[in-house]
A protein has these predicted regions:
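Active-site HxH/HxHxD metal-binding segment of metal-dependent hydrolases
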Residues: 37-41, 45-123
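Residue-level marker for buried hydrophobic side chains located in beta-strands
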Residues: 30, 58, 82, 156-158, ...
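Metallo-beta-lactamase
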Residues: 37, 124, 130-214, 221
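Short Gly/Pro-enriched turn/cap motifs at secondary-structure boundaries
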Residues: 9-11, 114-116, 136-140
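Conserved beta-strand hairpin/beta-sheet module of binuclear metal-dependent hydrolase folds
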Residues: 1-47, 146-162
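Short Pro/Gly-enriched beta-strand edge/turn motifs at strand-loop
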Residues: 1-6, 103-107, 128-132
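Short catalytic-loop micro-motif centered on adjacent basic/acidic residues
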Residues: 29-33, 56-58, 134-136
Length: 222
């Protein structure tokens, strides 16, 4: 676990990169995705935080490497609230969508979990003094979202899986992806926390990463 900027942390990577924000309020801690290993998240207890203080989790999209332990996390923390986009809600909340969740890729079974809030448009989630801009960025999946939040005057973008991949089983759409990437470029983020390939800063590196994948993924379907 390491601090990225004040109150924003990288917990680790198991399935995907999992990030945490300390709202410094009675709203407690917020996760960006959950990954596939609850023990990895439990390690925050040894870094001066408490698992029991995790109250929120924003699910960036419906893939198993990002939501694999959500049901387990709900049993551990019954009051945790999950957020996601309505267009990815069915495979998150129901079983039997192994292509949509990519569970078939991993040879696992998805255990459904209910969303507390389903976004239908760009939405600001206010927790403590933080405004989490939940931005609809379809392409990788129909309900993919990216999250923008400010800390110490820096724009921090959680852009999970901006690299893809794109697959018919995921209901990917490359035209949507191109528009989504332009939307993210227009945000002019200072820090990018990606889902699998690390943390990019300053703003010039964020722009380069997004532009590179935007260019590469014009026709790249698998």
């Amino acid at each position: 676990m390491k601090q990225i900027i004040k109150n924003i942390y990288y917990i680790g990577d198991n399935g995907c990169s999992v990030y945490l924000v300390d709202t410094q309020s009675d709203q407690g801690l917020l996760l960006i995705d959950a990954g596939m290993d609850l023990n990895m998240i439990k390690q925050i207890d040894s870094h001066g935080m408490k698992l029991k203080n995790i109250q929120h989790c924003i699910i960036t999209h419906c893939h198993i490497d990002h939501i694999g332990i959500c049901a387990e996390l709900k049993r551990e923390l019954p009051n945790i609230q999950f957020y996601g986009h309505a267009l990815d809600a069915v495979p998150i909340e129901e079983s039997g969508h192994d292509d949509r969740t990519a569970a078939s890729w991993y040879g696992v079974i998805h255990e459904p979990v209910k969303l507390y809030q389903k976004f239908t448009s760009d939405t600001v989630l206010k927790l403590g003094s933080y405004d989490f801009q939940c931005i609809h960025t379809p392409g990788h999946t129909p309900g993919s979202i990216s999250v923008l939040v400010e800390s110490e005057g820096k724009k921090v973008l959680f852009g999970q899986d901006l690299h893809g991949p794109f697959n018919e089983g995921f209901l990917s759409n490359l035209q949507d992806y191109q528009m989504s990437m332009q939307k993210l470029l227009d945000l002019q983020a200072d820090i990018l926390c990606e889902g699998h390939f690390g943390i990019f800063q300053p703003a010039s590196q964020v722009r380069q990463y997004i532009e590179t994948h935007k260019h590469q993924n014009q026709t790249q379907f698998i």
